[in-house]
Every structure is written in structure tokens, then in C-alpha cells.
Amino acid sequence: LLKRATVLGNFNPRDYMERRVWITARDGERIPVSLVWHRDCPAQDSPMFITGYGAYEISSDPGFSVSRLSMLDRGVLYAVPHIRGGGEMGRAWYEQGRRLNKKHSFEDFVDATRALQKAHLADAWRTVANGGSAGGLLMGAIANMAPECYAGVEADVPFVDALTSILDPDLP
């Protein structure tokens, strides 16, 4: 039995498109990226909201959120790169994005952004990145690594004391 929540207004799930694409990171690793957009707004040089986490072996699985509808209805491409450090691709994926390998998480996110822009799915002048908590650390890194890729970067409750975290063997 699958329960569906009622969405108020003129919501029609057929109005939205989704796709999983794969990009190649700078070290050759293939990174999955989930995309969603409004059917009437083709993903071509679109404004993009790209969000990431990539920590603690937590998977950023695709899912429905009513809060995204207004953005999608305005032609924004919503992207979630499943970067190393998360749990989407198993334990080794997580290990490749933690502690001294954390740079892979940052590089994966930037490489996904650049790949979507190079493919003309997204416009760099209208790309905004978002991440919270450990994703806030990601936002701090990408803002410094590739400021030309983002019109804005939002770090929600950022976890940014990386040195203490790397030195503490009890933290993931």
C-alpha cells in the first residue's frame, strides 16, 4: 500500500521531468547527478539550484518536496550531485569522501556543476549552490575553489571546523 499526500493547488506530477545523469570527475570517477525540472521549461541554459551534502555515509536520495514546486514552476533546474562522502554508492564511496579524502567531495560537486553548465543544461550566471550542516562545509569549499561557477552560495548552519574533525578519529 502506497500512501500519497494530497498537494493543494493545480499540482500535476506529469508536469515535472526527472533524469539521472552521470558526469566524470577530474580523477576519472563517475558521479551520478539527479535532475528535476518543469516539463514546459526545457533544461537548456536554465537557472540552476544545485544542492549537496556528501558526508557521514548519508544518501541524498531523490524525493518529492512540495517546497520545490514554486522554483520548478519558474523554470529552475534542480540538481543533486551524489558526491563521494555520501552513502549512495556504498561504503567505498563514503570512504573516498571523508577525512583526508574529503577533497573528493568538493571536487565532485564543482565538476558536476561545470559539467551541467558545459552541457548547456545550466547557466553559470544563474547557478546557486546550497548545502547545510556538513553540506555547509562543502559550500565553503566550493565558494573558494570555483567562485566563477556560482552566482550565489548558501551555507545553512555550516559545519566548518574541518581541522578538528579530521584530527578526531571518532568522527566520520
Task: Please state what every model-predicted region is.
Residues V36, T51-G52, N130:
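Short hydrophobic segments within beta-strands
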Residues S46, V76, C149-A151:
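Short beta-strand segments enriched for Tyr within beta-sheet-rich domains
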Residues I31, P47, R126:
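Alpha/beta-hydrolase fold active-site loops
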Residues S46, Y53-I58, S133:
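Active-site glycine-rich loops that stabilize anionic/oxyanionic intermediates
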Residues L1-Q44, I58, P62-L69, D73-R74, ...:
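Non-catalytic accessory segments flanking enzyme active sites
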Residues M48, L72-H82:
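A fold-wide structural signal in alpha/beta-hydrolase
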